[in-house]
Amino acid sequence: MSQPLETFDVIVIGAGWYGLMAARTFLELAPDTNLLILDDGKTVGGVWSKERIYPSLFAQISHPLFEYSFYPMPEEDISPDGFVSGKTIQKYLEAFAKDHGLILHLRLETRVEKVKRGVNSNEWILEIKGDKPLACSKLIYATGANSSPIIPKWPREGFEKPVIHSLDLGRYQDYIANNVQKAVVVGRSKSSYDAVYHLLCAGKKVNWVMRDGQSGPFSLYAPTFMGLWNIADHISTRFASSFSPCIMSTDGFCYNFFQRSALGRVLTNMYWRTANYLSVSHAEYWRTENSEKLRPRPYSDGVFWGSGGIGIATAPDFWETFHRGDVTIHSTEIESVSHKDVTNLKNGYSIATDIIIHCTGFDKGYGAFDPQLRNELGLEYNTKEFSRWTMLDEKADQTVDRLLPYICDSPNQYGDSEASRSTGQGPNRHYRRLVVPELAARGDRSILFPGHIHSAFTPLAAELQALWGVSWMLGWRDLPSKEEMETEAANFNAWTRKRYLEQGRKHSYFIYDYIPYIDTLMKDLGLDPFRKSNVFEEWFVRYKPSDYKTILEEYRSVRRHEREMERSGEESVARMKRCD
């Protein structure tokens, strides 16, 4: 006879920003919950865990913007431009877990190999590598967007050097310092820029191999806007947000002016051309043929579309280090590796190397779900419902074109369809990027997907997603009809495809649009999204997490009011029945 499963009310998979906050929020709102947090790392933090960080790794967000609203981050190891180091972030998340009692609920070095439905359809069974399965009534799948590294496979004959992913760069610091003189870096994501900078600072020779796809290289902002203030501070203002055409912000004066009027669209175009010019001027791509290969596409406004990705040069001397460093860019792909230390390229060249570092990004971390369950959960496009979703997508395209004419004729040639197909065929079809419409419409509140978005302002997004999601899982809020939820998901996906081109075809991507997303979740919760004390601050002063530090108490107040109204209604009905 098989032993009974170890069962929990809630299991959270992932101990990064999203998983820790989801667990804390659940325990705050339902303190008696039997909750477990699982993570396959040796320490908390996810991509910011102790084993994954290295000295030159910094977040792309300035210090006061990269923290939970109610738990200030120490001002330690901050870059000259105000960016937070990986070491500081890891210590912060570890302290957060300890101070909020989450360590007692945590199991590290625990890999979930398979997730499936139990005999009871609202129960989830988790198969654990090298251990007994676990069961739970509610599952919070908070593995995030950076948990499943993409590692290409090539023909290999006699190659003996390490081949690692950028995720493992922290573990290989001693090896690189003592054994590496020449390195091959593969990819054009932000992590490739970080890896190249780190290697050049260590005096290594770098061969940077990046496929010459249509989406082009990563768009890298200067650390400051016009040399006056931190770029992350600038894009966290409502004023800057108004220049980005966004499906989550389609009303109000700024929308009607900047996105609907001819003059407003001219000013919007001028804003983005200026931003692109400042970015290009800071990078000085024209200095060499080598650096010209890193110029974002389209050349005139690459930082607006961000088809290859969008980020910030967090090291003040990044471009000077690059221009002076011993680095060669190869616009091709690796064909094979051989002869102990040789990397063979498709353009016919061969390169000797002491290590290969993949900076090839991340696939969607849904390998634990079988294909049928992935379709049921909206994690992949269901071919059975292809015609229905095609109609929804076509209507969504029309909606986006009507509401946001600035991106109506987006340059679709800047994309790599092969890359899109390899990453789950596009963004999830989830309502508010969190909930499966089909399950929610059936009253199934047993699974939530926080963190599967690409937004630079991670801590605040984690906090709002947690409060929104946990309150729904507890049955405290109802959602719209299935049709409305599916339309919302289709509209968002159509928008992000048009707005961010290749990135939007692969991910729920909204780097410039975090304020409208936060506003949307706040309104859903019945909370006031406008947090500043006056109109000037509301539009021109940066929004930071501490502006939201009272949202949990605010939501509790809303919840108390709702319960009082429910009781009042029940008493009225009871009185009417007595009168009858």
From Swiss-Prot:
Source superkingdom: Eukaryota
Pathway in which this enzyme or protein is active: Polyketide biosynthesis
UniProt-listed Enzyme Commission number(s): 1.-.-.-
Keywords, in A-Z order: FAD, Flavoprotein, Monooxygenase, NADP, Oxidoreductase
Positions that bind FAD: V47, W48, S49, K50, V112, M473
Database matches in SUPFAM superfamilies: FAD/NAD(P)-binding domain
InterPro entries referenced in this protein's UniProt entry, alphabetically: FAD/NAD-bd_sf, FMO-like
Enzyme class: oxidoreductase
Molecular function terms, GO-annotated: monooxygenase activity
Signal peptide start and end residues: none
Annotated Pfam families: Pyr_redox_3
UniProt induction comment: Expression correlates with the production of depudecin with high levels on oat grain medium, and minimal levels on oat flower medium and complete medium.
Cofactor: FAD
Chain residues that bind NADP(+): 58-60, 186-205, 222-223, 354-355
Family: Belongs to the FAD-binding monooxygenase family.
Task of the protein: Part of the gene cluster that mediates the biosynthesis of depudecin, a highly oxidized eleven-carbon linear polyketide that acts as a histone deacetylase (HDAC) inhibitor and makes a small contribution to pathogenesis. The reducing polyketide synthase DEP5 is the central enzyme in depudecin biosynthesis by yielding the backbone polyketide chain. The monooxygenases DEP2 and DEP4, as well as the uncharacterized protein DEP1, then act as tailoring enzymes to modify the intermediate polyketide chain into depudecin.
Name the UniProt record assigns to this protein: FAD-dependent monooxygenase DEP4
Source species taxonomy: Eukaryota, Fungi, Dikarya, Ascomycota, Pezizomycotina
Gene transcribed to yield this protein: DEP4
